[in-house]
Amino acid sequence: MQITIREPGSAITHFIGMMMAIIAATPLMVKAAVGSGAISCFALAIFIGSMVALYGASAIYHSVTVRDGILKIFRKLDHMMIFVLIAGSYTPVCLVILDAKSGYTLLAVVWGIAIIGMITKACWITCPKWFSSAIYISMGWVCLSVFGSLWNTLSRGAFLWLLAGGIIYTVGGVIYALKLPIFNSKHKNFGSHEIFHLFVMGGSICHFIFMYLYVA
């Protein structure tokens, strides 16, 4: 039986991302369980879960060949999980790094935006790419509201890993929004969207390193 993957480049990249997240969960959670408290373990579990959800939903959406109505549902889930990943990445920072007042306030804001964003995607999946990217990027940089606290609390190494992840995600979001021909290779299965996928994975790797070294 021949198996057909609808968009091989996009499906494979984020299937790899999902597997990397699953594999990375063990050392991260073991380290947190040994050296950190229950709140850290909970927050890091949310972070890992958000990565698995995003990469899993994306891999499935880009893999399946089904009728349009079902494919549209998978597409909505794919886009909705981006909000989950962003909020999930914020969660350990809010609960472990920041003080209670700033942390819980920021946590409520980002998860509030995530819920609104998911509802928007569920109702308006055809919104322009620039609009989606603007929301994703803006949500990602809400942390500027606590820049001073992060700068004063984190070591320079920790701050740089956190910042690097944000920058890489942002570059990927711009590539996704603009879909410039320069990013499209002669291979039809690997173009600007697949490059966007690689940038998302790069951002996740930076943030995983940050979580493992400085949060767990």
Predicted regions and their residues:
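Multi-pass alpha-helical transmembrane bundles in non-GPCR membrane proteins
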Residues: 1-216
